[in-house]
């Protein structure tokens, strides 16, 4: 009887997690919007290139 109880509990947990994943409104086909084109890392790399960066591995 104990094994049946554990099996039922595991099934309930799996079903509830599957339902939570399906409830998320994210659309897989949606195009992501880039609010920060280039980003901070690209800006810092550009600054390093302009200043002739002495640290070759980090200059890109």
Swiss-Prot record:
Source organism: Conus buxeus loroisii
Bias kind Basic and acidic residues: ranges: 25-35
Main localization, broad class: secreted
Tissue expression from the record: Expressed by the venom duct.
Keyword Transferase: no
Keywords for this protein: Amidation, D-amino acid, Disulfide bond, Ion channel impairing toxin, Neurotoxin, Secreted, Signal, Toxin
Protein name: Contryphan-Lo2
Keyword Protein transport applies: no
Region feature (Disordered): 25-45
The organism's taxonomic lineage, starting at the top: Eukaryota, Metazoa, Spiralia, Lophotrochozoa, Mollusca
Propeptide, residue positions: 20-50
Cited function: Its target is unknown, but this toxin may modulate voltage-activated calcium channels (Cav) or calcium-dependent potassium channels (KCa).
Modification D-tryptophan, positions: 55, 58
Signal peptide stretch: 1-19
Domains as described in the record: The cysteine framework is C-C.
GO CC annotation: extracellular region
Source superkingdom: Eukaryota
Subcellular location(s) of the protein: Secreted
Family: Belongs to the O2 superfamily. Contryphan family.
Record-annotated disulphide pairs: 53-59
Modification type Cysteine amide: residues: 59
InterPro entries: Conotoxin, Contryphan_CS
Pfam families: Conotoxin (PF02950)
Molecular-function GO terms, alphabetical: ion channel inhibitor activity; toxin activity
